[in-house]
Structure formats: structure tokens, C-alpha cells
């Protein structure tokens, strides 16, 4: 059985493991920045300058990483390209 692709978890995990600084914009207009130390289904633990913030996901509007994050590995991109071209040929 193939693994289900969870975009949110993969994105947050890449930010966490890469220790990539992010800006987090909240729905109330507040913004903060730091490094994601952990996350679960409902919260994100953000660390900045020896301070920790536990932010509820429902309060987040946008997460902007300071650098580009590649979510799909090269092999997966090539496999998807082959699947798409095969699908286009049959149509």
C-alpha cells in the first residue's frame, strides 16, 4: 500500500529538521518568527531567542520559511512525471 502524502506534516517536518527560520502570521495580525522545535495535530512549538511559544494551528494564517523547502524528492518528481505522461497518452 502506498504512503499517503500529508503536505502539512511533511512541510512542518522539513522546517523542523532543517532548522529553517520561519515567520508565522496569526489570524489576529500578530507575527512572530523562530525555529519550529515540535508540532502535533493542534499546535506548533516555536523557539526564538531562548523563548518558546506554543501556537495553536487554528490561530495561524500563514507560515513563511526563510528559504525554499523542497517537499518532494527528485525520485518522486520523476515518478510523478512518468505517471502524468502515461495518463496523457491514454486520453
Curated annotation (Swiss-Prot):
Coiled coil: none
Family matches, as SUPFAM superfamilies: Sm-like ribonucleoproteins
Matches recorded under PROSITE patterns: SM
UniProt GO MF annotations: RNA binding
Keyword Heme: no
GO cellular component entries: cytosol
Record flagged with keyword RNA-binding: yes
Keywords tagged on the record: RNA-binding, Stress response
All residue ranges annotated as the Sm domain in the record: 9-69
Protein's GO biological process: regulation of DNA-templated transcription; regulation of RNA stability; regulation of translation, ncRNA-mediated
Pfam families listed in its UniProt record: Hfq
Subunit structure: Homohexamer.
HAMAP family: Hfq
Family indicated by similarity: Belongs to the Hfq family.
Physiological role: RNA chaperone that binds small regulatory RNA (sRNAs) and mRNAs to facilitate mRNA translational regulation in response to envelope stress, environmental stress and changes in metabolite concentrations. Also binds with high specificity to tRNAs.
Name of protein: RNA-binding protein Hfq
Amino acid at each position: 500500500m502506498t504512503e499517503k502524502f500529508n503536505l502539512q506534516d511533511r512541510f512542518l517536518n522539513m522546517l523542523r529538521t532543517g532548522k529553517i527560520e520561519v515567520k508565522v502570521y496569526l489570524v489576529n495580525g500578530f507575527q512572530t518568527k523562530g525555529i519550529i522545535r515540535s508540532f502535533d495535530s493542534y499546535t506548533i512549538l516555536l523557539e526564538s531567542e531562548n523563548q518558546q511559544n506554543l501556537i495553536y494551528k487554528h490561530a495561524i494564517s500563514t507560515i513563511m520559511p526563510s528559504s525554499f523547502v523542497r517537499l518532494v524528492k527528485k525520485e518522486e518528481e520523476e515518478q510523478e512525471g512518468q505517471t502524468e505522461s502515461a495518463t496523457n497518452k491514454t486520453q
